[in-house]
């Protein structure tokens, strides 16, 4: 992944309005339009563009975040040959309709329903952290740091973490040898 226009996408995000409760997924109902749209975007990237650099898929309404590891989508959706066949038929115009709503209601809904109880994800609500912003104690800071780490590019793009406490700082080591 790099920062050019032609580079592969590493993160897919579907953002819903806070007032659009009918389309936003919930812990009780994952099979809603937000996840159906994520599935379509994922299949377009993975099947059509051969992009295997996707790391996470996120559905959010700015307060609630549902973060899916791309490995879950790979196992539950991409490896499902029947779904890939139906998706390709949809893309190639061999289905009754080529409208995205058709994909959501006739294809995505069926396959999400099959895996919704076993689909793993991380969930949190930013409003649950609001009260921590005014506190100055270390436990509040730790919780906010954990949240910050989730949103970091290192985490979201699964970049290697360079600050290993067991590794030597090359500049410090060279200076130490010089002394």
Role assignments for model-derived ranges:
Residues 1-179:
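Charged, often flexible domain-edge or linker segments that flank or initiate folded functional domains
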């Amino acid at each position: 992944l790099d920062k050019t226009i032609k580079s592969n996408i590493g993160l897919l995000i579907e953002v819903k309005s806070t007032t659009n409760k009918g389309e936003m997924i919930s812990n009780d109902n994952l099979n809603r339009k937000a996840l159906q749209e994520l599935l379509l975007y994922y299949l377009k990237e993975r099947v059509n563009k051969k992009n295997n650099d996707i790391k996470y898929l996120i559905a959010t309404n700015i307060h609630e975040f549902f973060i899916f590891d791309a490995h879950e989508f790979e196992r539950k959706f991409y490896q499902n040959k029947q779904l890939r066949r139906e998706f390709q038929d949809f893309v190639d115009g061999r289905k009754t309709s080529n409208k995205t709503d058709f994909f959501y209601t006739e294809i995505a809904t069926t396959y999400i329903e099959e895996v919704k109880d076993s689909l793993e994800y991380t969930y949190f609500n930013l409003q649950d952290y609001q009260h921590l912003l005014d506190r100055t104690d270390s436990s509040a800071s730790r919780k906010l740091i954990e949240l910050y780490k989730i949103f970091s590019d290192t985490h979201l793009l699964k970049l290697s973490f360079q600050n290993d406490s067991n590794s030597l700082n090359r500049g410090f080591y060279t200076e130490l040898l010089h002394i």
